[in-house]
């Protein structure tokens, strides 16, 4: 019990943000809840909505982010939950804002493809199987 009281006292005096790994991120200024807790994440970086500052109207910042996103490339990027995402590679915004690839597919060039079967994206995006080969379980094998 003394250890818990000591830990709470140290955390209360600390100015370092505290991260709680349970689907939520919490610190002294920001608070948000991860709405994608049921999604299996790969080792690739996944774009999530940024934390929102409590008690502050962020509309000016949000507008700036979306305008900057459109300036980068109106046809390749999208402002999704106030975050600029790449429509050619983002699984949650593949080809257009909000179009989510189903489990087992990957966003390659703005199209959701099954990299285990697709001859033009075998095992990874843009990995084309040679003529006479088929994509089987993500590997190019002789037909």
From Swiss-Prot:
UniProt keywords (A-Z) are: Apoplast, Secreted, Signal
- Point out the signal peptide segment: 1-23
Report whether Secreted shows up as a keyword of the record.
yes
User: Cellular component terms, GO, for this chain's entry?
Assistant: apoplast
User: Where do the segments described as Sufficient for PI(3)P binding lie?
Assistant: 88-115
What residue spans carry the region label Sufficient for binding to the extracellular domain of PRK2? Answer: 80-83
Which stretches does the entry tag as region Sufficient for PI(4)P binding? Answer: 76-87
InterPro entries recorded: Stig-like (IPR006969)
One Pfam match, by short name? Stig1
Tissue expression per record: Expressed in the stigma and the upper section of the style.
Q: Is this entry keyworded Signal?
A: yes
Where is the protein localized?
Secreted, Extracellular space, Apoplast
In UniProt terms, what is the effect of altering residue 81 to A? Strongly decreased interaction with PRK2 and loss of growth-promoting activity
Function of the protein: Promotes pollen tube growth. A C-terminal peptide is cleaved from the propeptide in the stigmatic exudate and represent the major form of STIG1. Binds phosphoinositol lipids. The binding of external phosphatidylinositol 3-phosphate (PI(3)P) and PRK2 by STIG1 induces a rapid intracellular reactive oxygen species elevation.
User: Oligomeric state and partners?
Assistant: Interacts with PRK1 and PRK2 (via extracellular domain).
Family from the record: Belongs to the STIG1 family.
Q: What is this protein called?
A: Protein STIG1
Species source reads: Solanum lycopersicum (Tomato)
